[in-house]
Amino acid sequence: MNKNTSTVVSPSLLEKDPAFQMITIAKETGLGLKVLGGINRNEGPLVYIQEIIPGGDCYKDGRLKPGDQLVSVNKESMIGVSFEEAKSIITGAKLRLESAWEIAFIRQKSDNIQPENLSCTSLIEASGEYGPQASTLSLFSSPPEILIPKTSSTPKTNNDILSSCEIKTGYNKTVQIPITSENSTVGLSNTDVASAWTENYGLQEKISLNPSVRFKAEKLEMALNYLGIQPTKEQHQALRQQVQADSKGTVSFGDFVQVARNLFCLQLDEVNVGAHEISNILDSQLLPCDSSEADEMERLKCERDDALKEVNTLKEKLLESDKQRKQLTEELQNVKQEAKAVVEETRALRSRIHLAEAAQRQAHGMEMDYEEVIRLLEAKITELKAQLADYSDQNKESVQDLKKRIMVLDCQLRKSEMARKTFEASTEKLLHFVEAIQEVFSDNSTPLSNLSERRAVLASQTSLTPLGRNGRSIPATLALESKELVKSVRALLDMDCLPYGWEEAYTADGIKYFINHVTQTTSWIHPVMSVLNLSRSEENEEDCSRELPNQKS
């Protein structure tokens, strides 16, 4: 991408200039300066004083003169700024609450030079990784004389297109300097140059090209870029189609200007560009400069290239920083959404817990004690888990102990659940048995047939054996059935009675074994049976020890 840039001079170099001055002016009404120049104007890239308005602070002070170069205003640099930025700096300094103007400027060598005589410009092309860079350096014109170009003092570029120029002096004498173009396919004769003269005194210069002169199409398109017009791909194609090129790739200058006017009329109107400006871009004007000025210009060009590289590097870093900031912002939004979802899920879980607790509170009285135990165990588990989380980094042994206790309590919780189910089953059997007894004893006047049928129904409900056929031994049968019921209930209650911390489990093959969560051990034998066997073996040993002394005696 081609950009129009300007050669700027660093403030540190300007301060070494003997013409550099720093003045302070009392702030009363306003600065009263009219400026021109800037990096986006033909008079640039530097900013000069065009006029000092009467009644302003500078007019009252009298030290500034038209034609002086402004370096800074109130410590704000005027180097490398556009015309609009320069005006904005002056306006901003006026609005600040400061008691004085601090102005740095460079007094030009000749005091009678006016800004309107700043018409000698030079086009410098710099090649590098950023493509060709165009910069315009404004110079003051010297007293009327004939400028003869010298090879040693004229800056050379890769794409210079030089033509004949006519210079009018104060003696009304026209001198034509024919210069050949390296890239032009047609030599320019004296008839190819049209001179434009003015009647004003001093040095006046104007260059015009014959419309029949032919140039490379790339050179003319590059001139459009220098004028601030960036054609699109479609406009490039349309321009190549409408302009007829010969076998050498050259086109007529007049045809190109006419097609460009029709194709880029809006852009040309905005920048106020005509054929004269395009010819000025194509023709490198000759500047009277010595070797030191050429070296200074080359050094400034290198500084400008370095500054452009640094600016592009900073832009890339800024883009990368913006990209990272956007990425972090997106990640933060995602984290916030996830946190919000977790909070909502937690609230839903809490609501479900409250509903479960309400349902448990509404259960019958037999389950109240069990629920109380469950709540206490849950609170204890929560407390132990909290303690485990708080002291996990401080004491690993305590963590292991807490884990064991949690596992034991969890085991006891599951055993309590099984006990509750066992109690419910036993209670249900007892209730059915009591209801059957009530039915039998409450209806003594019922016929034997009806009584036997009701007994059969009750027996099927309570899993009892049918009572006697004739009903004569009802009390004895009830007593017998009650004993059997007591045995079955007791068997249910004693069936899975495991000690504290013990729990039964099954292998993948379905073999039952027992886990002791307290000691972290397993056993194939029921812990109660192992204890009984151990006690019996101890008793046998004691008996044997007692029998041995008796035999000896």
UniProtKB/Swiss-Prot annotation:
It is found in: Cytoplasm. One of its GO terms (biological process) is cellular response to type II interferon. The keyword Repeat applies. One of its GO terms (cellular component) is cytoplasmic vesicle. Its main location: cytoplasm. Phosphorylated on Ser-99 by PKB/AKT2 after insulin treatment. Phosphorylation on Ser-99 abolishes the interaction with STX4A. Disulfide bonds: none annotated. GO terms for molecular function: syntaxin binding. Residues 19-105 form the PDZ domain. Keywords: Coiled coil, Cytoplasm, Phosphoprotein, Repeat. Residues 496-529 form the WW domain. The modification Phosphoserine is found at S10, S12, S99, S212, S463. InterPro entries: PDZ (IPR001478), PDZ_scaffold (IPR051342), PDZ_sf (IPR036034), WW_dom (IPR001202), WW_dom_sf (IPR036020). Residues 291-417 form a coiled coil. Pfam families: PDZ, WW. Interacts with STX4A. PANTHER family: MULTIPLE PDZ DOMAIN PROTEIN, SYNTAXIN-BINDING PROTEIN 4. Plays a role in the translocation of transport vesicles from the cytoplasm to the plasma membrane. Inhibits the translocation of SLC2A4 from intracellular vesicles to the plasma membrane by STX4A binding and preventing the interaction between STX4A and VAMP2. Stimulation with insulin disrupts the interaction with STX4A, leading to increased levels of SLC2A4 at the plasma membrane. May also play a role in the regulation of insulin release by pancreatic beta cells after stimulation by glucose. This is Syntaxin-binding protein 4. It comes from Homo sapiens. The lineage of its organism: Eukaryota, Metazoa, Chordata, Craniata, Vertebrata.
